[in-house]
Design a protein with these regions (language model features):
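Loop-to-transmembrane helix boundary motifs in multi-pass membrane proteins
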Residues: 92-93, 129-134, 237, 241, ...
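Juxtamembrane transmembrane-helix boundary signature
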Residues: 29, 56-90, 98-108, 253
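Helix-loop-helix module between adjacent transmembrane segments
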Residues: 63-71, 93-113, 122-147, 203-204, ...
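Extracellular/periplasmic helix-exit of transmembrane alpha-helices
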Residues: 65-73, 77, 218-219, 240-269
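Transmembrane alpha-helical segments of multi-pass small-molecule transport proteins
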Residues: 97-99, 123-144, 161-165, 327-342, ...
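Extracellular loop-to-transmembrane helix junctions
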Residues: 17, 44-69, 83, 87, ...
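Hydrophobic alpha-helical segments and their helix-loop junctions in multi-pass secondary transporters
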Residues: 160-187, 195-216, 372-381, 406-418
Length: 420
């Protein structure tokens, strides 16, 4: 089952140009991963608990590296996507379970992206009744035509405005001693909202769709076993970049909003955190980045989801396939976009809560995907000499166990009537 393509040796490839070339996709993926739900979750963490949730980020960075590196390595060794490997290793019935989890999680996240678009454009005075249908149509057209790649880098560039959180954090004047302590000393609270936010943070940092996307990207690049080292550089750099930005979002909101007692209930509240650097332009800066990041993810998620499902069950897929050739592939994309847009347009819907809830759903369903991934990655017959080592297996199973326990605690608290 291993990918036997002949490649030049890895040693020949480890030049400065090759290393920087390998880092590019990971860094871009990191920025696109900080989407509407991610910004909402990290902003809420800082606004609600100050720096007290920073300790999670070093842990999440390690776990993100583990899951993304595993995905990339599986792609290099087998030349196949995760969905195909799940079907081959576990059969069709268990593939249905994996794909159902992915479909639910990704649809929830896509809904949050449209909520982010609606929230961002509302700051410019555009009502959701106008913005959501128009953007949904544009997303559908770009996804169906495959022309999304033409504007992908532009959107990534615009979404880079969230890097300004790094500058804003320094300008806000945080207590760096307190930041350093909270970064390394775990702060566990029995507050139900805290537990929910922990699950959401895990779900937005290690999203199920990112695992499928990482492996598919490696397969699409025709990377082989000799590319594993370069792909490892890619994953490590991307994971660190993603969580550095996440950390500064928490520091910024923890410095600006938490002392003032401002709880984030909408995009306008979150935008206030950028006032130290942008002043009266903070709303414009935040809204532009939120819309770009949300639109980017909204274009990626339906395609990733549909491609994985079709791959798992052997159906035709790809933007180059017509409706007659790939009706299921195109139908799933259309359904996800349509359902997401309609739900966001429902009267009285809380857009910010949608963004938060989607990340909780991500966290709850993540163990399902991780179980399949770790079993495949540890299989000698599939991975050969590149199978998971003991440390990687322990970290992955520990992640699965912790998330499962947190999920049970969260649901028990809800059943007991506590507000989560």
């Amino acid at each position: 089952m291993q990918n036997t393509k002949q490649k030049p040796s890895t040693k020949q490839k480890l030049t400065i140009a090759a290393i920087f070339g390998a880092m590019g996709p990971g860094l871009l993926a990191a920025l696109s991963g900080n989407d509407a739900g991610g910004i909402a979750t990290y902003s809420s963490a800082g606004a609600s608990y100050g720096y007290k949730m920073l300790w999670m980020l070093p842990v999440m960075t390690v776990l993100l590296i583990v899951t993304q590196e595993t995905a990339a390595r599986c792609g290099c060794v087998t030349g196949k996507g995760l969905a195909s490997l799940i079907r081959e290793r576990f059969g069709v019935r268990k593939s249905v379970l994996a794909m159902a989890a992915l479909l639910i999680a990704n649809t929830a996240v896509t809904i949050s992206e449209f909520a982010g678009i609606a929230s961002g454009l509302a700051l410019f005075g555009v009502p959701a009744s106008i913005s959501v249908p128009l953007v949904a149509l544009l997303v559908w057209m770009l996804t169906m035509s495959g022309s999304f790649q033409r504007i992908e880098k532009i959107l990534l560039l615009v979404s880079c405005v969230f890097v300004t959180y790094i500058v804003a954090a320094f300008m806000a004047g945080p207590n760096w001693g307190e930041v350093a302590v909270d970064l390394v000393v775990p702060n566990i609270q029995n507050d139900p909202s805290y537990v929910s936010l922990v699950v959401a943070t895990i779900g937005t940092t290690i999203a199920p769709w990112m695992i499928f996307l990482a492996q598919n990207n490696v397969v699409d690049k025709n990377a082989g076993e000799d590319d594993i080292v370069l792909q490892r550089i890619d994953t490590v750099s991307g994971s660190i970049a993603a969580d550095v930005i996440a950390g500064f979002i928490i520091i910024t909101t923890g410095t600006v909003l938490f002392p003032a007692g401002i709880q984030i209930s909408d995009a306008a509240d979150a935008a206030r955190a950028l006032e130290p650097i942008a002043g009266q332009w903070s709303t414009v800066l935040f809204a532009s980045g939120l819309v770009a990041a949300s639109f980017l993810a909204a274009c990626v998620l339906p395609g990733v989801t549909s491609s994985a499902i079709c791959e798992a069950f052997g159906w035709e897929r790809g933007a180059d396939r017509s409706w007659d050739e790939a009706p299921v592939y195109r139908g799933i994309i259309t359904a996800i976009i349509g359902i997401s847009a309609v739900l966001v347009l429902m009267p009285g819907v809380d857009l910010f809560q949608i963004m938060m809830t989607s990340q909780v759903i991500n966290g709850v369903l993540l163990p399902v995907v991780l179980v399949f991934q770790v079993v495949i990655a540890a299989d000698r017959h599939i991975m050969g000499a590149n199978r998971n080592g003991r440390v990687w297996n322990v970290l992955t199973w520990a992640t699965i166990g912790v998330i499962t326990v947190l999920t049970v605690v969260m649901f028990v608290l809800q059943a007991m009537g506590y507000s989560v």
